From Swiss-Prot:
Keywords: Ribonucleoprotein, Ribosomal protein. The keyword Ribonucleoprotein applies. It comes from the Bacteria. Pfam families: Ribosomal_L32p (PF01783). Belongs to the bacterial ribosomal protein bL32 family. It comes from Synechococcus sp. (strain JA-3-3Ab). One of its GO terms (biological process) is translation. GO terms for molecular function: structural constituent of ribosome. This is Large ribosomal subunit protein bL32. InterPro entries: Ribosomal_bL32. GO terms for cellular component: large ribosomal subunit. The lineage of its organism: Bacteria, Bacillati, Cyanobacteriota, Cyanophyceae, Synechococcales.
Length: 60
């Protein structure tokens, strides 16, 4: 016979939300760090498509 589940306490729900939010903040921080590295030219450990320069576009 089916039995209703127990309600999750607010403390547990808030703790799970805080963990989720912390992970999201960490990912955002990492993305900003990579973005800053690309813009400053200090990138060494990853690849990304480079935009064509004006000289290359003029030759075509």
């Amino acid at each position: 016979m089916p039995v209703p589940k127990k309600k999750t306490s607010k403390a547990r729900s808030r703790r799970r939300y805080a963990v989720w939010l912390g992970k999201a903040k960490l990912q955002a921080q990492r993305a900003m760090t990579i973005g800053r590295a690309i813009l400053s030219g200090r990138n060494t450990g990853f690849y990304y498509p480079k935009a064509k320069s004006e000289e290359e576009e003029g030759e075509e």
